[in-house]
Amino acid sequence: MIYQSVANRKKGEKMKWITRERVKVDRVACPWLIKKFVDKAAEFYFVPTDQVASEARRMGAIPFDAPGVELGHHGKECSFEAIVKEYRLAGDLALVLLARIVNGADTDNTLYNQPEGPGLGAIAEGFRHLGFENDLEINAAEWIVYDALYAYCQQMVRLGKLEGAFK
């Protein structure tokens, strides 16, 4: 059960989301997905792993990409995929392809063997070494990568290449 949804929040209230600090792939991709497709006014908090559950309860925030949470890894699926499913976004085939790429970057890439995944993983790792002050800054800087990947995925869907250009 998700703690908060777009439909049940009070008028003007922002959805709060919380995850582990020291972002990499899923903890950048998920906030991008949430802001673009779930709640444009969402707020994000990044805390030590052992504080995610307690801070989520205290703040009334939705935990994601943390051990044991509903919107986390399940089997070989990543948190991005869990959010796509929970918020019924799988009708957007470009998002489905993007989810496969994110999975390939965030996991061992054996579920889909998505060729674009390792490249995204390398880019995400590079952002961690550019000297940003905090996780919010990394997210702000890196979202352009997800905008570009989503545009790529949309083009692949238009061309009928639902598994991307390299498969």
Residue ranges and their predicted role:
Residues 12, 22-25:
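Intrinsically disordered, low-complexity regions
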Residues 17-20, 27-91, 95:
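Conserved, aromatic- and glycine-enriched, well-ordered alpha/beta core segments
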Residues 26-27, 139:
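Active-site-proximal structural scaffolding
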Residues 85-167:
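A charged, amphipathic interaction segment
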